[in-house]
């Protein structure tokens, strides 16, 4: 792995301070019609709640959080699923974010881990080496195919080491970025049509970035991985607490948030009118809020779909940047089987499937029915991303279930009863998110990314997609909410706090 100091020293957060625009009195007719606050926070996900807490800590309590859903949580979202064998009580599964990614070093913790520990959320490190490999005629047993799999793993490891070194050189030498596919090929990793090689690659690239190598930046994929997994320990702790992963920031919100006066749930924003003097938010129910400052924490997917209008229209440099980043889709498909029908080795965490025809076709199964997770639950889930996610979302549950069961019967070479419960969430079709999390594609420059983040007058933007290093991670949402809250608190206290923008970018 690259030295993170080497990379991060070359990738500084692009921020510049200029004098904040003073808020001024708004027109009397707007004042009369709309409720009035100092700060409007749009979205009650992790970025929004973190920004609100920062403001509250600074003594700024005249704010309102506006949220589309009937809950705090955003993409950290669990759901009742299946039934416990000895009662009618359900289990709970995480439909969205599920892991604490990067845990701690000798000197500091990932802030997500700190909060998970604060509220005693049950979490366990995933062991990605606890893996059994399958193809269409069953398990890859010791023998020729098993040796080939080990050989491919070794080749991939060597290629990724060169790939990561090259990413550092791209940054240090200010070279043109390229796709992860090109970078891996230069490092002599060329899986072409070999299913085992494709499966290994999928479990490393697609499973992490919700996009294939062709859609992923070599340079920034390495920055993204190194900042989490070298700054902190290279661990992924799966949260499997029945209270839900979002508990940690729901509980934080209870410490300061007055839900009667500072939180508007089930409120759909339709227009944001902004200037260097104030921001007015118009909602579908006819209500409106005028604020001195606003923080927009909408997902990249919502901004790309343009389902919320802006007045004036977002400048071209910002629209270009928004459309140039990628919103990935990561779909977990859950199945519960009767205890007597569990057909997999309960000591194994992961099952990798190398489909002979289609790369990424129901490739990665994970067992929750394991002594370290939700023992006795009979729950197995499979993850798909990108194009396969879109296919799954477009077809009915029965079709998807039939396809998965055909794969499982090929893998395990036996008759397997259908699951007693089955569910997946359609993230791409959710009108409040339109996807799972962001990814950095080849061709998106650091300056263009900063334009997603840059404020427009008194309107600020924050979320996992706006962080140049932790995009796609919960810690990205946390840090960006914190940064935006601190910047606006600084503005309110008549200090500097504007972020830089790049209106004229020439490649």
Language-model features: locations:
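FAD-dinucleotide binding site
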Residues: 5-12, 21-507
